[in-house]
Swiss-Prot record:
The keyword Ribosomal protein appears for this protein: yes
Cysteines engaged in disulfide bonds, as pairs: none
GO cellular component: cytoplasm; ribonucleoprotein complex; ribosome
Protein name: Large ribosomal subunit protein bL33
Organism for this UniProt entry: Chlorobium luteolum (strain DSM 273 / BCRC 81028 / 2530) (Pelodictyon luteolum)
One Gene Ontology term from the biological process aspect of the record: translation
Family: Belongs to the bacterial ribosomal protein bL33 family.
Alphabetical list of NCBIfam families matching this protein: PRK00504.1, PRK00595.1, rpmG_bact
Keywords assigned by UniProt, alphabetized: Ribonucleoprotein, Ribosomal protein
GO-annotated molecular function: structural constituent of ribosome
UniProt-listed InterPro entries: Ribosomal_bL33, Ribosomal_bL33_sf, Ribosomal_zn-bd
Length: 60
């Protein structure tokens, strides 16, 4: 039998550079495997408000 999907959780990624500049932040939601990736996720994603790729960090 197949194992369940209890290891995958939904997370939210928030732009860090827009927060520093005082602009509107962009947010993405994605999933991660909490057994393989125990620390906070940091990805480079597109921010449409700043019109460039910026760092997005995982928030609670």
């Amino acid at each position: 039998m197949a194992k369940g999907k209890e290891n995958r959780i939904v997370i939210t990624l928030e732009c860090t550079e827009a927060k520093k500049e005082g602009k509107t932040v962009s947010r993405y939601s994605t999933t991660k495997n909490k057994k393989n990736t125990t620390d906070r996720l940091v990805l480079k994603k597109y921010n449409p408000n700043l019109q460039r790729h910026t760092l997005h960090k995982e928030i609670k």
